[in-house]
Each structure stands twice: as structure tokens, then as C-alpha cells.
Amino acid sequence: EKLIYVVNWRKVFPNARLIVPIDNTSLTKTFITAAEVLPLSRDEVSAKIFASYLFEFDVATYLFDLLTPAQADDDYDIQQHLLPAGNGFCGMAYSDVFVALKKQYNAILIGVSSIGPDGEYQLSKNPADNRLIESNDYLILILSGGSSNRLNEALQASIG
């Protein structure tokens, strides 16, 4: 039922990026190929978090903190920031931006999403040191609530 709805919705909004909750994980590939969506299974996500709690308790605790929005200055969050043209980080190597963000804002750069040849954003997790940061890249960061506001002002960037 969801697949039919999503396929029909896709006809009206062909360029929309969709995340669809699914109950039947055997339909994951079907959703990806037929409807061009990112299927999200609550059971798969829950199982991975549960396994972390069993075998890597500290990792699971940290993950839980990252999955919830930062409420206080010492809470941590994962955010993405769109880097506008003319920002000082544009044209710099990933490793240099990583070090600068850590030293200046106590933020950890964990990935970059940039426009690929097909015009869609492509996520690079922990890219090579020499990868150049460009305008309109999304910087994927782990940072505290206290660092977030300062970083927004300094980057002249928007979240999301």
C-alpha cells in the first residue's frame, strides 16, 4: 500500500527526496528501485541500537545522545551546515577544515555532502584529507549545543 502511494506521489513530485517508514524489510530494494526513496525500518534501526547496548555500551550511550537534539550547551548533536559561497573554508582541504573546526569550535567534521555529476548530493563519510571543500557543500558535524550557535554565526551557514 505504501509503495503504491509513494510511486503515485513520485509522479506528481518527481524531484522530491523521500524517506519512507517500512514494516517489511524484504521490500527495501523494491522501494529503492521502484520509487527512488530511502526506506527506513524501525525494526532494523532498533536492532542495531540494541546490539550496540549489548556489546558496546558507551558507543550506544553516545549514539543516543547524538540522535536526540542538543538541549543544553553540553549536549551533543549531529548537524549539517550548508556552506555558502565566499566562506573562508571554501577551497580548503578537508583535513585543514577538520582541524580548524575542532580547534576553534570544538566541532568534529565527520563528512561532506556535495553535488555530484547527476546534480544530486552525494555523501562522503570521513573523506580523504586532500578533498577540497566547496561552496554549497554540506558539512556534517558532531558538536555541542554551545558550539552550534557560535559556528552558525562564524560560517554564515544554515543548518539543514
Stretches with model-predicted labels:
Residues E1-G160:
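Cytosolic regulatory regions of ion transport systems
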